[in-house]
């Protein structure tokens, strides 16, 4: 069996990552989580049925996204969890993570089968095991479920 890999979009991402397929809308979401070292982090959306591509630049480092039932997103940004409305571009804070480490930020994350959004922290210099694994529950409470992560 052989596969053919095809480039769908030449969007110039520095670090395109975290793809999420929204089965309800037929849309592919992903992040260009470059951080402020290269340019503004951004959220991207591709509608394969039309070829339409949208992106939103952020003033925060972005680590992960999850799709909500209403077509909006939940984001794991550098300092906490946020709602994001693609129609307005508005960010709404859900909760900050209680992390005293100045070099840490939320990085990668995914939703489990119970609908809980997990996001792990990372040390920007990848040296110290001081980060946590955080869980955002459907009641919007957050819990630190593990620590000692680099």
Give the location of each predicted region:
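Residue-level detector of Asp-centered blade-edge/turn motifs that repeat once per structural unit
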Residues: 21-25, 67-70, 111-114
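A short loop-to-beta-strand structural motif that recurs across blades of beta-propeller domains
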Residues: 41-44, 80, 131-134
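Hydrophobic alpha-helical segments and helix pairs
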Residues: 91-147
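Residue position within the beta-strands of beta-propeller blades
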Residues: 29-32, 74-76, 118-120
């Amino acid at each position: 069996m052989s596969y053919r890999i095809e480039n769908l979009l030449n969007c110039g991402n520095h670090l395109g990552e975290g793809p999420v397929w929204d089965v309800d809308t037929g849309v592919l979401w992903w992040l260009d989580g470059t951080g402020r070292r290269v340019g503004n982090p951004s959220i991207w959306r591709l509608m394969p049925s039309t070829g339409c591509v949208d992106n939103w630049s952020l003033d925060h480092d972005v680590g992960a996204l999850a799709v909500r039932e209403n077509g909006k997103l939940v984001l794991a940004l550098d300092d906490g969890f946020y709602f994001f409305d693609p129609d307005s571009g508005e960010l709404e804070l859900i909760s900050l993570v209680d992390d005293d480490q100045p070099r840490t930020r939320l990085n990668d994350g995914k939703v489990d089968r119970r609908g809980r959004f997990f996001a792990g922290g990372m040390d920007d210099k990848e040296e110290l095991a001081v980060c946590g694994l955080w869980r955002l529950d459907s009641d919007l409470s957050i819990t630190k479920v593990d620590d000692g992560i680099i």
